[in-house]
């Protein structure tokens, strides 16, 4: 009986220690994100999706903490929202049962992976029935650089089937701010629910654009995002974001 009690205490200690580590990783990553009070940047988007054509597009994007965004663009264009203008805390709040995994692929000790299940209510997807709600529970693997405390990649999957991937490249701007300079977003679609989710995650700047997958065929799409001409912590005012 005493051995069983000690064993239970041991596993409780491990569980509490892991939760403390997870909270530390999220807190440090969010702290790094919060150092950027506001910024202005030129964003270039190139989209490669079957049956959908859009020329390379340029946006002038303004951002101010916590969630003020202003986008200037001429003509039609789309801009993916996933992870671009949301804090790490907000993103991790959409996950449950978060666990820590080491990055065994490249044996890099300066990177860790936090993996969790998506909270379906956060997706705001209409499910046709309760069975779909129970079976459509994606897992998200978030790779964190523990030296610079930034998110390097996000992979969303159901078991081993990948739904979409985000990869970010960074460099120091003004020798001070570690900012993304390139993002690549890959979509793998073979389900109407997933296609609907993607459409929820695409922000139409002008017009109403939908990616259709009526035949449930596998669609692989790529969105390439490049960031240039950063102006960071200029002291933008809130009133600027409400001007038309």
Which residues does each PLM region occupy?
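N-terminal leader/targeting segments and the immediate start of mature chains
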Residues: 11-51, 55, 105, 243
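A mature extracytoplasmic/lumenal domain signature
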Residues: 43-47, 65-67, 73-77, 116-120, ...
């Amino acid at each position: 009986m005493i051995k069983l009690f000690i064993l239970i205490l041991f596993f409780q200690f491990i569980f509490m220690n892991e939760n403390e580590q997870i909270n530390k990783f999220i807190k440090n990553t969010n702290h790094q994100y919060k150092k950027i009070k506001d910024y202005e940047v030129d964003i270039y988007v190139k989209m490669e999706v079957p049956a959908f054509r859009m020329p390379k597009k340029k946006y002038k994007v303004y951002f101010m903490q916590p969630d003020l965004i202003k986008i200037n663009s001429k003509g039609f264009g789309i801009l993916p929202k996933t992870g671009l203008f949301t804090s790490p805390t907000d993103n991790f709040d959409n996950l449950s049962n978060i666990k820590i995994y080491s990055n065994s692929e490249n044996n890099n000790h300066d990177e860790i992976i936090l993996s969790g299940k998506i909270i379906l209510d956060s997706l705001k997807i209409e499910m046709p029935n309760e069975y779909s709600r129970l079976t459509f529970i994606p897992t998200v693997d978030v790779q964190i650089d523990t030296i610079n405390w930034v998110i390097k990649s996000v992979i969303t999957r159901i078991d081993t089937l990948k739904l979409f991937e985000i990869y970010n490249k960074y460099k120091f701007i003004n020798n001070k701010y570690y900012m993304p300079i390139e993002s690549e977003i890959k979509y793998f679609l073979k389900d109407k629910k997933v296609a609907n989710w993607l459409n929820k995650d695409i922000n139409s700047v002008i017009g109403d654009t939908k990616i259709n997958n009526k035949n449930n065929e596998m669609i692989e799409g790529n969105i390439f995002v490049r960031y240039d001409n950063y102006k960071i912590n200029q002291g933008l005012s809130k009133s600027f974001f409400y001007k038309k």
